[in-house]
Amino acid sequence: VPGYDPANYVTERVWVTARDGVKVPVSLVYRKGFAKNGTAALLQYGYGSYGASMDPGFSVTTVSLLDRGMVYALAHIRGGQEMGRQWYEDGKLLNKRNTFTDFIDVTDALVQQGYAAQDRVAAYGGSAGGLLMGAISNMAPDKYRVILSQVPFVDVVTTMLDASIPLTTNEYDEWGNPE
């Protein structure tokens, strides 16, 4: 990437206490010289499904945002498997709400700790992470200026009720069988 120098960026791992007392890891990246004074814009990403661990990685589009003063946060919420199998179990089926509240609690903590201005927070997720975006838009709409939901999986019950849809029966372990 022309002009990219990794020395210009800082990565950080912080832990946020969720409303039920569980510690949720968050990976952050921002441009060197960033002032943690509560004025920056934040793009927070989440997935939290299928036991998929979301490892931090390089993205040229993220660098463009960092160069404009944004903070990027990857919330390692329950439903993934970053903290082991129980982390996954604690974010699926009847525990799915933990995925959503973890994400919201991460947002609250990052704003409170000065990583972002309360009115400059954007949330992003796709596919099953799109379900997360749908949930937070209903549970905490005032906390996000923008919510981007790519190819969202938002009608879980209807999908799980139709066994003729490809892959539906394979998804029962994640979402349950509503019949």
State the predicted function of each range.
Residues 33, 51-52, 80, 93:
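Short strand->helix junction
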Residues 38-40, 119-120:
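Short coil/turn segments at beta-strand junctions that form active-site/ligand-binding loops
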Residues 40, 46-52, 127:
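Active-site glycine-rich loops that stabilize anionic/oxyanionic intermediates
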Residues 40-41, 144:
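Local beta-strand N-terminus motif with an aromatic residue
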